[in-house]
């Protein structure tokens, strides 16, 4: 079966109030102890597959989970093993999942043909949690709310567990999301795609599935407006949720922050350029997306100065400059991502991506026409302004770069509507211009940063002069790249 489940992290100071609120309803308490397994080389975890044996009360249940469509959907199969009569955990047997989608995923992950013998599994880590749960009716749906408190153990290492899970038992995913929004708003919770198994893998130091980048939106060539928009928004949300979960959990890794900003930019492009194709896109979503994007941008820029720009200046013969003074006003990335406004926006977008349209929306012909018009408008704006790039002020230069990025993302979103080869060729042709504009923008950012440092740090004047001298040639290089790009025939013509 396919499981739709939302997992919310609970800050320590909100645990008791949340427990008290949950106990007001008809709840069940259960201790759940589980052991997780994999092959000796981590082949299952490498494909995002989880196999566990869990004691639920006096019963043993073997469960396998595999990735589904989207970050919140999972393929799952439970196999009842029997009652706990001997007081010991039964042996884990992968064949118990045979003939199911999860079982097929396990065979693919292990490279086994049908009927081939499964390899032995090894014990990796354990979970020991107390679950307080209740099932509620919300909207047209039935949702199980489960609060898990406990710990994950791997050898002598442990990490605490404080999670609220909302699992859709019956009905519409958007109802489960709307219910989760209430919990987040009242108790300051935040969405997370980091499961107990992922936490256990990290604690045990074992292999885990690689983080997936942005995936192409999947919809039919003759899709109408609403189907296209929800598919695109869902595809944009997946990497945003994944990276936001890491940052909210404490990661300040440059790649996590960079990819989260890329994901937010893609999402904003979808909402801006495709809004006319369906109803339900709320203009209020833009503000928290922009605020988060800009706050994370400060962190990215200052990291780029330290990792890339400062070594570049020193290699050019300049003095070392301590840029730490610029870090004073940089917000904590985790706090930025856990902010209630951003979390509520993510929830609202999730609900939208799951929603059936109130009205049929634009038909295929109208959808294709409107997408073509949006592509042509962005393309024309880039070429017109970019032709004189070197003479533009900085604001208008930055606008050219932003419009080019929107053109690239919209090209990716629209790909199923047009010829695949022509679309890909056009997308590839954008890259040289985007790289030129990106380099120019990074050096302009560095120039302003060192200029701000210079009055108090005289050594920064070398960088100010160095980047100032590079500005005009790089602007002309961008202008030339626009001319080259203008020779590429649009795929929508």
Locations of the language-model features?
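Function-determining surface determinants
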Residues: 1-493
């Amino acid at each position: 079966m396919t499981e739709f489940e939302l997992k919310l992290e609970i800050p320590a100071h909100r645990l008791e109030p949340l427990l008290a609120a949950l106990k007001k309803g008809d709840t069940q308490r259960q201790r759940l102890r589980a052991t997780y397994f994999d092959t000796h080389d981590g082949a299952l975890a490498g494909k995002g597959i989880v196999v566990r044996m869990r004691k639920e009360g006096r019963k043993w249940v073997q469960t396998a989970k595999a990735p589904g469509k989207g970050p919140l959907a999972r393929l799952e199969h439970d196999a009842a093993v029997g009652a706990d009569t001997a007081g010991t955990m039964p042996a884990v047997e992968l064949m118990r999942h045979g003939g199911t989608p999860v079982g097929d995923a396990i065979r693919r992950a292990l490279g086994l043909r049908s009927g081939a013998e499964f390899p032995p599994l090894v014990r990796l880590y354990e979970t020991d949690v107390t679950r307080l749960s209740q099932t509620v009716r919300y909207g047209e749906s039935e949702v199980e709310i489960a609060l898990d408190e406990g710990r994950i153990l791997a050898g002598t290492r442990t990490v605490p567990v404080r999670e609220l899970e909302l699992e859709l038992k019956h009905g519409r995913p958007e109802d489960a999301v709307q219910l989760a929004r209430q919990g987040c708003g009242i108790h300051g919770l935040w969405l997370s795609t980091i499961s107990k198994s992922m936490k256990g893998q990290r604690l045990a130091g074992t292999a885990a599935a690689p983080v997936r980048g942005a995936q192409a939106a999947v919809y039919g060539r003759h899709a109408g407006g609403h189907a296209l928009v929800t598919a695109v928004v869902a595809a944009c949300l997946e990497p945003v949720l994944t990276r936001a979960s890491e940052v909210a959990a404490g990661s300040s890794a440059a790649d996590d922050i960079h990819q989260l900003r890329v994901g937010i930019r893609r999402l904003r492009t979808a909402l801006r350029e495709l809004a006319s194709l369906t109803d339900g896109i709320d203009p209020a979503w833009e503000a928290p997306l922009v605020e988060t994007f800009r706050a994370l941008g400060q962190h990215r820029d200052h990291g780029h100065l330290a990792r890339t720009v400062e070594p570049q200046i020193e290699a050019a013969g300049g003095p070392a400059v301590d840029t730490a003074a610029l870090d004073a006003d940089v917000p904590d990335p985790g706090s930025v991502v856990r902010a209630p406004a951003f979390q509520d926006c993510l929830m609202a977008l999730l609900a939208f991506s799951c929603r059936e349209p109130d009205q049929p929306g634009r038909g295929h012909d109208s959808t294709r026409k409107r997408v073509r018009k949006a592509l042509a408008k962005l393309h024309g704006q880039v070429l017109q302004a970019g032709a004189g790039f070197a003479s533009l002020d900085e604001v208008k230069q930055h606008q050219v770069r932003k419009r080019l990025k929107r053109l690239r993302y919209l090209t990716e979103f629209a790909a199923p509507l047009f010829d695949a080869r022509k679309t890909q060729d056009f997308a590839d042709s954008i890259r040289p211009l985007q790289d030129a504009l990106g380099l120019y923008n990074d050096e302009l950012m560095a120039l302003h940063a060192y200029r701000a440092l210079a009055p108090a740090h005289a050594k920064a004047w070398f960088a100010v002069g160095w980047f100032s001298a590079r500005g005009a040639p790089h602007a002309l290089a961008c202008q030339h790249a626009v001319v080259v790009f203008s020779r590429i025939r649009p795929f929508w013509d």
